[in-house]
Amino acid sequence: GYPVQPYGVKDNPNSILDVADIVFINPVNTGYSRKVVDKDGKMPDDKLFFGVNADIKYLAGWMNTFTTRHNRWESPKYIIGESYGGTRVMGLSLELQNRQWMYLNGVIMVSPADYKVLRVGGPVSSALNLPYYTATAWYHNKLPEALQSKDLLEILPESEAYAIDTLIPALAKGGFIDADEKMAVSEKMAYYSGLSQKVILQHNLDVPNSFFWKELLRDDTGQTIGRLDSRYLGIDKKESGDRPDYSAELTSWLHSFTPAINHYIKSELKFKTDLKYNMFGSVRPWNNDDDNTRDNLRLAMAQNPYLKVLNQSGYYDGATTYFNAKYTLSQIDPSGKMKDRFTFKGYRSGHMM
């Protein structure tokens, strides 16, 4: 929820520091990381850092340097990335192998963002949202009794199957869908989403996440739900509109994480600096050209038969939905020959585990 100052930090009882070293990397302009002048006194070009492939390249080089300086080439190595970091680690898996000759034991993606789906949009991207709508509506007690009376994990497979088997084909028909089929699909979408059949038809079966965050509780409390974690509630200036005024969950997290990390670094680690710790970094414009990270991970796995992949997603994450992540895993290796090396874990949480 919304913690009240003063903040504190406490030991994590589930820490793995007794069996592994954890190395956190802040890419340029996040945390305390900044560009510095080169040997000629010139500031490096942003293009060397702010892009899908540039980001992967310099971070792979940093990881090689760190591993060499600390003599950890014989150690097992796992890389983990959250949100955009999911895209990053998919690309790093191949970059590390082919450019740094560093072979990984595992890649872990937490709430990964697959821009092959998110940016392209269309029937698949839209339909993959439905199971997230189901999870959120269940949490807020907005589903029909036949679903609401069951546990979340009992009903999600139903919604997933409907999204793949029925909703994608229906959306793919666009304006040529038969009127009776459109009506039947809208009725079932209402059943699984907690939204009214009327608003679903008004959106021609293609209901955006942002509208869902605004609409689900509109006629009840009038509150909005969070983007990154739909358990959080927000209060907009007006109940009308098609998207929330702000991200309720994000304001809560920044409200607590920012003082905590600054206190810990300065008081516990005794690191003194006036430099601002960036919770978010200025990295735009970001070059998204030639994003082949999904294919890069497949090739890395093909080249390295010991490389395994773990995906962790929260059912209440509306930014990078859990079913989008499941879909991504299924598309990495269409042959299915490596499917036993993929593991998906879902959690009753949001974007942040």
Predicted regions and their residues:
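A catalytic-pocket lid/entrance helix-loop region that shapes and gates access to the active site
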Residues: 93, 97-191
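N-terminal cap/lid subdomain of alpha/beta-hydrolase-fold enzymes
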Residues: 1-48, 330
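Alpha/beta-hydrolase fold nucleophile elbow
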Residues: 71-84
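Alpha/beta-hydrolase fold catalytic core
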Residues: 173-320
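Histidine-bearing beta->alpha loop at or near hydrolase active sites
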Residues: 112-114, 315-316, 341-353
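Active-site-adjacent alpha-helix of alpha/beta-hydrolase-fold enzymes
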Residues: 318-341
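Residue in the alpha/beta-hydrolase core beta-strand immediately N-terminal to the catalytic nucleophile
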Residues: 26, 78, 106-108
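Catalytic nucleophile loop
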Residues: 85-90
